[in-house]
Regions:
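Acidic catalytic cores of enzymes that act on phosphate-bearing nucleotides/polynucleotides
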Residues: 1-81
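Active-site metal-binding core of divalent-cation-utilizing nuclease and nuclease-like domains
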Residues: 64-105, 129-192, 201-206, 210-211
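Generic alpha-helical structural element
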Residues: 6, 10, 60, 64, ...
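Class I S-adenosyl-L-methionine
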Residues: 1-26, 132, 169-170, 251-256, ...
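Generic recognition of stable, solvent-exposed alpha-helical segments in well-folded globular domains
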Residues: 12, 16, 84, 121, ...
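Catalytic cores of nucleic-acid endonucleases
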Residues: 154, 158-163, 171-176, 180-274
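Short Cys/His-based metal-binding microdomains
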Residues: 94-126
Length: 274
């Protein structure tokens, strides 16, 4: 698949994916319980947008290559098919205590289990990918990244109060700290995610910004010389608008410095991260 306009592809793919899956969903869900229909609607809405870019790009480069077995699992996951064959959750928390809860075949519990090792692996993998794309050997010339930096402006009152990564010496930008969150759009937990795409991703992004203030809430004056951006994703693929904008900004910076086609570079970043 050749380079495409990032906005045109993302919106077009999202619309087609939503229409096709919703039509199939309506046919399959006639006899489903109401809650199962809500789960299915939330999943379909969460699959589209920029987060679907990987469908058009795997495997156009080594960073988008996916083993066949993993590809099958990913497709099954996004189609709402069974992806987990065990009965009991295998997760163990940081204190060594196993979860032990009963698991559903669709993996819903695994996606939201607070003790999940896979939960943190996925989160850290996304952050590491951003660091590599922006400041790795083939990243933005001159850019630097810091992993889990301490930021005195945001004391660590909870595990997630400080930043996951910091990006420095970005062309035309302030130093920027980011904090990531990968959430499961569960209609039982998040009201409205079965009727509006991106409900969970956008809510989590707002929450991250509230935890990492850069401007005074009363007079809106800048408090710090740096910026903050939330990297907020839904597990089925949807990205918060703020996350899309920051990713596009980084990709455009690299394209500008290296004389690349901005649209193709933005698509490349979307595909690798998604």
């Amino acid at each position: 698949v050749g380079p495409r306009s990032d906005k045109k592809w993302a919106s077009g793919a999202s619309e087609k994916l939503y229409k096709n899956l919703k039509h199939a969903l309506e046919e399959d869900s006639v006899n489903l319980p109401r809650l199962e229909c809500k789960y299915a609607n939330a999943r379909v809405l969460s699959c589209g947008g920029t987060g679907a870019q990987w469908l058009a790009q795997a495997p156009t480069c080594h960073l988008t290559q996916i083993p066949d077995d993993d590809m099958r699992t990913v497709i099954r996951f996004r189609l709402g098919k069974e992806t987990f064959c065990a009965d009991v959750c295998p997760h163990i928390n940081a204190d060594g205590v196993p979860c032990g809860k009963q698991c559903d075949r669709e993996g819903r519990h695994l996606l939201s289990c607070p003790s999940g090792g896979g939960f943190f692996v996925g989160h850290d993998s996304v952050c590491a990918t951003y660091c590599a794309l922006a400041a790795g050997a083939d990243g933005i010339p001159g850019a630097q990244a810091a992993w889990k930096p301490r930021v005195d402006a945001w004391p660590r009152s909870t595990r997630g109060a400080e930043a996951d990564a910091g990006f420095f010496r970005l062309p035309g930008s302030r130093d920027t700290y980011v904090d990531a969150v990968c959430s499961y759009a569960n209609p039982v937990t998040y009201r409205g995610c079965d009727s509006t795409a991106g409900t969970v991703a956008e809510w989590k992004a707002r929450k991250k910004n509230a935890e990492h203030p850069v401007f005074d809430a009363q007079n809106h004056r800048r408090l710090h010389p740096f910026d903050f951006r939330a990297l907020s994703f839904e597990r089925h693929g949807y990205w918060a608008k703020e996350t899309v904008g920051f990713t596009k900004k980084l990709a455009f910076a690299r394209a500008s410095v290296l004389g690349l086609d901005p649209a193709a570079e933005i698509c490349r970043w979307y595909g690798i991260i998604s």
